[in-house]
Amino acid sequence: PAVFGPLYPVLQQIKQAFDPLNQMNPGKIAGPSLMTIDGVPLRGQSDRQINPATRAAYAPALSCNGNGACFAQSAAEVMCPSYKATLDRRHSPKGRAGLVREWLRQGGPDGRADPVFERQVKEALDGCLSCRACSRACPVQVDVPSFRVKFMEAWHRRHRRPLRDHALSVLEPMLPLAARVAPLFNLTVSLPVMRWIGLHHLPRLPADTLDVPVLGRALPDPAQAVIIVPDAFTRYFEPALVADLATLIRAVGKEPWLAPYRPSGKPLHVAGRLGAFRRTAKRQAALLTRLHESGFTLVGIEPAVTLAYGDEYHEAVGAALPVLLPQDWLAGVADRLPAPLREGRARLLTHCTEGTLRPDAGEVWSRVFAQVGITLERPATGCCGMAGTWGHEVRNAATSARIFAQSWAGQVRAEVPVLATGFSCRCQTQVQAGVVLRHPLSHLAERVQVSMKVT
């Protein structure tokens, strides 16, 4: 028939005129006109429509080459927890990078992107746990959290922030006051209004007090002192853990001192409040730089906060701050710890951000524990599903539980003590499995105290 002969190109022209994107019954009856080899659109053509300054600011999004390594589904793979839980490619680093790429092409940072599409981009980025796995596990290091926060900053210039954002943003500066009225704080976070705001399973403040001296105007001898840099989570929700680190500092013949508490700004950064984060980071950096220049050793506890001093702070204040993870400091003094009384075993689960930014973190812990006669099991795990405050948001509840079930659920019960370095990981395990995990510092301090009493 003529329709498949001379008239077919005419049908193709009609199809092209009325359905230029080939969205209606693609491939049925007539397809669009064939493209020439040099007419196939390439990624670079779209990228060149983005102005150079914006391309530089969002370089990690534009670096995605589509290799698809982020589609791994193994529970032992750290990348990407949100994709493994949803199997939705929009919730993978590749999907998010592609969406942000198109948002940039449309002029999103200047408010010129299609509003319906822009909301879809936000939904994809809301699902990101900011675990940083993609920043190292991706072959081209597509760092989704780095451009996620910039998108959120641009989005909230034009859209009101939800109450949960405001509540989480004031958490760090509010905690010193809240700790003075802990029963009132605990009552407040247990009220139904918190779920209405969009938050649940919030931790409670303990009645414990912290008996570690705080630095004042008169500074101790830097050669004898070790400064604990407090973070909001362990300082106020787990003061006993800070005391355990102080015990270990004393065990090696040093004096523990607590740096004056200052907010780190980590929750501000995750929320895309970059201006407020920079101001907070500069204040904290001024204090820590002064202490470092005075010759003090600085040690943090919470991995996500401690690592932020060398990562997010580098961009915010132009320098990485030398705050050590606890195992890094312990590794240098472990030979001074009391000799072990007996051999033992334990299982260690590291915070996903810690394992990503410091792949050797678990190995360093193993060396430290070996000095006190403990062999550490270090099973490969992904994210626990809490990721700071992400799992505390009601909207993320189902995905958070699914992520935990895929990886951590099978590791938190064992015949040996199970230890976890992340505060949010310990919270998540208690919420999802009803299991209370200890920090490795607490297990180590207990072991050392027993040895010291006997000897």
What are these regions (language model features)?
Residues 2, 52, 126, 135, ...:
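Conserved aromatic-histidine-acidic binding/catalytic patches
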Residues 19, 26, 33, 145-455:
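Iron-sulfur cluster-binding electron-transfer modules in prokaryotic oxidoreductases
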Residues 51-75, 115-131, 253-261, 372-382, ...:
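Immediate flanking context of iron-sulfur cluster ligation sites
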Residues 64, 70, 80, 128-134, ...:
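Short cysteine clusters
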Residues 71, 77-78, 87-90, 135-141, ...:
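Cys/His-rich zinc-coordinating "finger/knuckle" motifs
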